[in-house]
Structure formats: C-alpha cells, structure tokens
Amino acid sequence: MTQPVMKQAGQFTIAGISGDGGQTAKVWARFEEMYGAKPFAKAYADACEVRFYSNEEQGKDIFVGYALAEGADVGGFETLVLPAVPYAVFDVLVTQGYDSGNATMDKWLDDNAHIYGALEMDGKGFIVECYTERFKDGDKPDSVVEMWVPLYRVCQSCSMPMTKAADFGKNADGTPSADYCCYCHSNGAFGNPDETLEEMIESCIPFCWEQYVDDDAARADMRARFPKLKRWAK
C-alpha cells in the first residue's frame, strides 16, 4: 500500500440500507435486490460501503448503497449524510484482504496526528469503502478498493480539533484559515501574537482536564506534541 491521496469531498448523501458487518455479502445482496426493484437516481456509478467502529447498535455497523443524485427521490431506502471534510484515500488490493491496509492507515494517522485526526460520526469511528471501476469483482490480482478515511484538521497553534466550519479562524480576506482555530486566529493574525509556547500550553490545560490524570501529564504531553505544530515548529 502506498501513501494516501488527499481529497477534499463535499457533503453527499448515500441512499441504501444498514446491516450487520459480519454478514456483508447478505446485506449487499438485499440492497441490490431492493435497488433492482426500485432504483433511484445516482450521483455517480461507484458503490459505497460505510463501516462503523465502536458501534453499540448490533446489526447496524455497516451502511451500503450509492451516492444519491441531488433532488432525487430516495424511495424506501435509508439515507446517510457524509460530511464535507478532507479524506485520506488509501488503495487496498482485494487479493491481499480488506484488512491488509489497516497497519499502514494506523501508522499514517499516528505520523500525522499533529495535522489530522480521524473524524467520528455520532461518537463512532467510520471508514468509507469505495468501489470504483478499479474494483474488478474482487477476483483479479489488480482489483483495488479505495478506503476513504475521514479527517478533521488540528489547529496548528493550540491543537484543538477543528471538526466544523465554525471552528476555523479567518484569514485577512475573510476566508477560513486552513491551519488555525477561531480562538487563536482572526482577521489573519493571532489574538496574542507575542504568546510563547509555554504560555499557550498553560492556557490549554484547563480545557483538557478530562483527557489527562493531572496537569503534569497534560503539560508533558503538550510539550511533546506542540513543537510539531506549524506555529511553534523550529
């Protein structure tokens, strides 16, 4: 598996059905039967499978279907809205197994944790499997499935997760900052331009007490992570 391709996707809706991830083939067969009987307009031809993790709803840890065309009648299908966020897209050779890329994806997320985090939906981790024209029924040596890992950006000043549009700061021209949160950056400038790294760490500690056993643990972790952030990188 190579390094991922970064893609920024707009919000889109998948129409389909949910089911048991342990019975994937049966879920797909049921969806295809339903779609054959009552098709809906697709936004594009690729099929999608969304897998959820840490899911307490038994039997509803996958969602399969197609992207719904804008304004199309969904009929009797369920819908799942995927957010407009960046995705890290990994290619996985089907013959090596769908889980064969997990270690590479985990390592990439760990190596880039100062820039990105894995986005959750309603408290659950998820990944989108896309079946494009490169997926050749899974029985060819070069058959590929794309694994789309949804991401949020990390503020490059205070490391706050920026998971929604309101979290981002503003550039001087009013456009959203790609790097800094609304608390650190406004109108193209830092709110406290003379702030030191240590001062930033101390100001962040009261907001993350749930993540650490005590202030010293928080301080030690931030001292290890913050120098990698864009504002503080040497």
Please place each PLM-identified region on the residue numbering:
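Short, non-ligating residues that shape and space the ligands of small metal-coordination modules
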Residues: K164-A165, F190-P193
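Short, intrinsically disordered terminal segments enriched in charged and Pro/Gly residues
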Residues: L197-K234
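Short linker/helix segments within small regulatory modules
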Residues: F168-A178
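Cys/His-coordinated zinc-binding microdomains
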Residues: S159-M160, C184-G188
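Short cysteine-rich clusters marking metal-coordination/redox-active sites
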Residues: C155-C158, C181
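Short amphipathic alpha-helical surface patches that serve as generic macromolecular interface elements
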Residues: D99-D106, A178, I201, I205
